[in-house]
């Protein structure tokens, strides 16, 4: 449908959502809609139980037709989840999607002021008045069209990366799989059995590697590191290095599945790599039938869930249970004990694993972070929380359950990809619930323990999820990306002093200096965060959809004036 004329007299429609009882249970939404009708340029207003429902969306479309609306304001929940829905709704009726304004009267009003409904109602009136004032100043914007290169780059040849690469190649996309080690498989190459079914790790990973090597549309580069990445969603140029040889690749989407590393517990519980070893080292001994110990003690949460690493590694408990059960199968007379702070066995299958361990005679003793076990030459002292006494146990073999930690080169790769890391140097997804496989940077996706410690099953699932997200881009010849970006209009270029502050502060690396020393904003990379505009001392940069007149109109109308 062709877009409606937006430069005629402004006609605003306001739609107030009850959001069930989230908003309607605190303030009078009908009265709020009636108030909206009194505002300048508002020609229609109504309230809905759920504006995002089919009925609510149909009501918006009907009002646009019947009242010739050319601006729409929805006062409801949060734009993070629902703005795309309402933009699509008005677009179907011929309005430019940027002639829509979202007013959050739930998160910013009724949720935080639920005990003060009278004051919340007055604040909601202010928010709608301000949102309507901005809507009057809105201008139509064009979405940016980008041509897509239907190829994918997967960084990391572990189980998550291989799963992702196989999925993409089977969908018909040219796929490049990059692995820095000389063999695919990652940590699976060194494990013995996989929980909870105790499948042989080598057989499992070799089958996946065989599928990768025989796959069509899939090129594998082992002993290869990423050296440089340029471009944006749909058009990435990647330089990799394999055995000192540089190779140039191009891709439309990138999947990051570089996995994680294992903590070496130096200076923790007397670790020596011989009698006091890690679970990872125990796997090798079990595979080679090198376990002869009679008294075996395992300590959980070694180097994790503390001030230095406050997170739970999630796989350590199940790994300990698995290895303890294998030891009991190999050496039935062995005394196996697990010292734990908390046991993490989610789901019925994993809980059943724990029950099996108890039935096999494996002992569990809970210890406290403030009273850590004391490891001596051939015995260990532990304060038993349940009986309130210190207990002494002999050991022939002490096994330390250490966490998965972020790779040392994550920072370097994050800088190349222009994506963020979280506080523990794992990669940070765009949103843990809404966009768990995406980065904030369009066209780059993540899976496996690169973003957080996960087990094999979860790593495979996340690898497929990342491939699925990447395919939503690669399956199109062109895509539209955000139009509300920063810009340096021609009429403002004489204001630019070339200070380059905008280049330094841009978190998406969307601004660069050209060969002619002019500032250039790559709109396909820009997310419209506004940092550059806020730091530009000469006001040369314009933030589309958040222009000075639009923001000032909200401020002035809040104070009882207009601009």
Task: Write out the residue ranges for each language-model feature.
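Rossmann-like dinucleotide/flavin-binding elements
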Residues: 4-9, 55, 65-67, 110-115, ...
């Amino acid at each position: 449908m062709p877009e409606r004329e937006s430069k005629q007299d402004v006609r605003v429609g306001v739609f107030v959502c009850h959001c069930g009882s989230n908003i309607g249970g605190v303030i009078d939404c009908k009265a709020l809609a009636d108030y909206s009708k009194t505002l300048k340029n508002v020609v229609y207003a109504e309230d809905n139980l759920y504006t995002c429902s089919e009925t609510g969306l149909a009501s918006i479309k009907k009002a646009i037709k019947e009242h010739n609306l050319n601006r729409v304001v929805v006062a409801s929940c949060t734009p993070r989840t629902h703005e795309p829905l309402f933009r699509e709704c008005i677009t179907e009726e011929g309005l430019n999607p940027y002639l829509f304004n979202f007013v959050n009267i739930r998160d910013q009003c009724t949720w935080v002021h639920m005990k003060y409904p009278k004051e919340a109602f007055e604040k909601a009136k202010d928010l709608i008045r301000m949102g309507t004032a901005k809507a009057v100043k809105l201008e139509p914007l064009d979405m940016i069209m980008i041509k897509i290169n239907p190829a994918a780059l997967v960084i990391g040849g572990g189980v998550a990366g291989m799963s992702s690469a196989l999925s993409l190649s089977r969908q018909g996309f040219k796929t490049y799989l990059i692995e820095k080690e000389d063999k695919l498989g990652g940590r699976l190459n060194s494990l013995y059995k996989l929980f909870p079914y105790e499948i042989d790790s080598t057989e499992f990973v070799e089958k996946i590697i065989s599928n990768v090597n025989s796959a069509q549309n899939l090129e594998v580069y082992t002993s290869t590191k990423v050296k440089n990445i340029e471009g944006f969603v749909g058009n990435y140029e990647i330089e990799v290095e394999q055995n000192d040889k540089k190779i140039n690749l191009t891709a439309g989407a990138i999947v990051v599945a570089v996995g994680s590393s294992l903590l070496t517990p130096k200076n923790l519980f007397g670790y020596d790599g011989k009698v006091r070893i890690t679970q990872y080292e125990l796997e090798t001994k079990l595979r080679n039938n090198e376990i002869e110990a009679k008294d075996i003690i395992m300590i959980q949460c070694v180097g994790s869930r503390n001030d230095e690493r406050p997170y739970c590694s999630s796989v350590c408990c199940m790994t300990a249970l698995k290895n303890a059960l294998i030891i009991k199968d190999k050496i039935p007379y062995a005394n196996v004990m697990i010292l734990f702070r908390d046991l993490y066995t989610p789901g019925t299958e994993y809980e059943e694993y724990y029950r099996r361990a108890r039935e096999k005679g494996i002992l569990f003793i809970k210890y406290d972070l403030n009273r850590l076990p004391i490891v001596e030459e051939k015995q260990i002292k532990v304060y038993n929380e349940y009986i309130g006494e210190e207990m002494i146990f002999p050991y022939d073999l002490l096994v330390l359950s250490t966490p998965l930690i972020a790779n040392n080169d994550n920072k370097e790769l994050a800088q190349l990809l222009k994506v963020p890391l979280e506080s523990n140097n794992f990669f940070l997804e765009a949103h843990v619930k809404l966009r768990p496989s995406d980065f904030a940077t369009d066209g780059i996706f993540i899976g496996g323990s690169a973003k957080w410690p996960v087990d094999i099953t979860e790593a495979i699932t996340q690898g497929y999820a990342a491939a699925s997200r990447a395919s939503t881009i690669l399956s199109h010849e062109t895509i539209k990306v955000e139009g509300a970006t920063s810009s340096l209009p021609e009429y403002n270029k004489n204001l630019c002093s070339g200070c380059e502050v905008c280049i330094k502060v841009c978190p998406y690396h969307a601004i660069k200096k050209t060969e002619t020393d002019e500032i250039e904003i790559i709109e396909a990379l820009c997310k419209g965060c506004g940092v550059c505009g806020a730091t530009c001392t000469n006001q040369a940069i314009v933030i589309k959809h958040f222009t000075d007149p639009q923001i000032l109109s909200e401020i002035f109308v809040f104070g009882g004036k207009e601009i």
